[in-house]
Each structure stands twice: as structure tokens, then as C-alpha cells.
Amino acid sequence: MTFSPRIIKELLQTSDHQLQELKETYARLPATRCRRRTRCCSMLPEMTLVEALPVIRRLGEMAGDMRKRLIQKTIGYFFLNPVEITSCPFLEGQECRVYPDRFFGCRSYGLWSQAHYEALAVRDRKAKKHLQEQWKSLGVCLPKKVVDFQVPYCLCVETNGPEVIDDKTLLKASDRIEAISAGFSSRHQWFARRYFSDLSFLLSALMFGYKQSVQMKFTLVRDMVHTENRSKLDKIIQELPDLCAALT
């Protein structure tokens, strides 16, 4: 099964309870400050369906020009991320355009212990290695700089007050968010398993269709690796219609 604009619209209209629970879970995390080096914004993080929905809603509420730009950047990210580290599509300058609805991965970055963060990094490297082999089996060798890229551990995040947060608290919050999202039943599983917890994949599939997005990604990535030319992708992105018109 795949998502359609109709299903996303239905979820946006009927998910107020789950989104309130998500807000309450986020509110239990301490407020933080950092030096705004935007290292945590190097990539769009994985997320659950319940985390993706507030951002889709926020996009729909934005002024037309900004909404169009961010959707273009997010869909462009889906096609470009195997060949280039472009930063999160919601980062502009040093500002996050969806900051109030930023994902758990953004909120927890810099709060994990260094040991736990390294464990997450090991898992991420294994996943990237598997992805590299999948592309290689299709005749595409991904750039080493992309495959080897790892968001560095950050020592610059501090809580605003005396509260100390530990891995156990963060894991509890993560589990709670997963449980809230699981309330969407099979749709939660679709997003995790078929869309790989990737908002950029979801928006691309809503725009072009699921199978067409996968085929387009293979063709565009193959061509960009072989030619180092992204003009075909740029043309596609520039001509995108307003996706949110079908979701609101």
C-alpha cells in the first residue's frame, strides 16, 4: 500500500489527538541552546509518521512562495542525497523553517551521550554500506564522500536550566513517539517500511507516484554520477506544481 494525497489529507484532518500527544512528549524534553553551527542540519533525519504530519501541515499554512521553495528543496533532496550532501531542505541560512515542529532527531542531537551517539553512528554506517551495495548492484557507484559522511558528535548543545537529561530519558521519549505513531496502524508501518521513514520520499511519491519516484531516482542518480550534471533534475524541480493544493 502507498499514500495518496487523499490519505494524507484525511490524516491531517483526523490526527489532532495524536499531534497533541506528540507536543506533550516534546514538552517533557528540556529547552536547549547551541552555537548554531547547523551541523545537525546536514541531513534530513529519519522520523515517524506522526512527526511528519505537523511539518506537512505547516507547509500547507505557509505563504505560497516559501511553501513552493521548501517543497522543491525537499523533493530535490530525495533525488540528490545519494550523490551530494546538501543539508536539510528546511535549513535556510541558520534558520530552520519548521523549527516549532522539528523532528525528534533534531531535538535529541547533542543530548545523547557520546557512547550512545557512537552506537547510532555504527548503525548508520552499516545502513549506508548496505545502500551502497544495493546501488552498486544496479551499476551505480555512489561518491565516497557521501557514503562516508557522518554528522559529527556535538558538544555545543546545553540545556537552558539545571536539568540534566540522560540516554534513558531520551529513549523513553523516542519509544513514546513510536507508540503514538503506531496508533495510525498500517499507515505507520507503510511510512517506516515502504518510505524508509523519509519525508522527502513521501513528498516525492505524492508528487510523481510511488513507482515513478523510485524509477526517476535511479535514472537521475545514475546520470548525475556518470555525468556530474544535475541540469535534468533542476528542470524537473523548477516545474513542480503546488503539491499542498491537493492536501488542503
What residues fall within each predicted segment?
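Short loop/turn segments that flank or connect secondary-structure elements
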Residues: 1-39, 46-95, 99-248
